[in-house]
A protein has these predicted regions:
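Strand-loop-strand
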Residues: 122-148
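Outer-membrane beta-barrel "beta-signal"
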Residues: 144-149, 176-188
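Flexible, small/polar- and glycine-enriched "cap/hinge" segments at structural transition points
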Residues: 109-111, 116, 141, 145, ...
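Residue-level signature of outer-membrane beta-barrel architecture
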Residues: 15-17, 94-96, 146-148, 159, ...
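Surface-exposed intrinsically disordered loops and tails
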Residues: 167-179
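Repeated loop/turn-to-beta-strand initiation elements of outer-membrane beta-barrel proteins
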Residues: 20-25, 100-104, 146-155
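C-terminal outer-membrane beta-barrel translocator/porin domains of Gram-negative envelope proteins
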Residues: 1-97, 106-127, 131
Length: 188
């Protein structure tokens, strides 16, 4: 068939709080769901949700988290970009004016994607409300922003705190090695 049948719903909520004359706290929540039906088992790849990257959980590379507890291995499915049918993302960021149009930022991000159905490569990605909070990837970090008026140039250094899959470590901070828990992003 030349087309895929699916319904995609997504919402975005942003709230700003002025903390000081030059400091602002920004809260952001983004959630979405895709339901494929008819001739499509999955929505087209470019419509699917993903987590990680400059506009998501900045401690991780783009499409490197999820779905659910899925962790790629050296199996025949290790090439799969990690996308899902359900997305939940939340960010909290403090922005402080440094000088002129230059701002510093401190952020905390959390999120993941899930599938609505089991897939042949993994059943660990299917959404389960009882495991929701344990399956959120969490990261923190710092950044620099330069406000050009029409757009903002930014660089963020993210540090992973928690991944949703089993790493052999217990607790909130379950990253095996600190050097594997960092990501640098440039965005406009």
């Amino acid at each position: 068939n030349p087309f895929a049948q699916f319904l995609k719903l997504e919402t975005d909520f942003v709230k700003y709080w002025r903390i000081t004359q030059d400091g602002t706290l920004v809260g952001h929540v983004n959630a979405g769901i895709i339901w494929s039906y008819g001739n499509a088992e999955n929505a087209p790849y470019y419509e699917q949700f993903y987590i990680g990257g400059a506009n998501s959980v900045r401690a991780f590379n783009v499409r490197s988290i999820g779905p659910g507890r899925y962790q790629p291995t050296n199996s025949k499915y290790s090439y799969i970009d990690q996308t899902g049918d359900i997305k939940y993302l939340m960010n909290l960021e403090y922005r402080q004016k440094v000088w002129g149009n230059l701002y510093g930022a401190l952020f905390l991000d959390a999120g993941n994607v899930w599938t609505l159905r089991n897939h042949e490569y993994s059943s660990l990605g299917k959404f389960d409300v009882d495991k929701f909070f344990r399956q959120l990837a969490v990261g923190t970090g710092v950044g620099v922003r330069y406000d050009m008026g029409m757009f903002v140039i930014r660089v963020d250094w993210g540090i992973g705190l928690h991944v949703p899959y089993d790493t052999g470590k217990n607790g909130i901070y379950n990253i095996r090695r600190f050097k594997d828990a960092q990501s640098l992003h440039f965005a406009v």
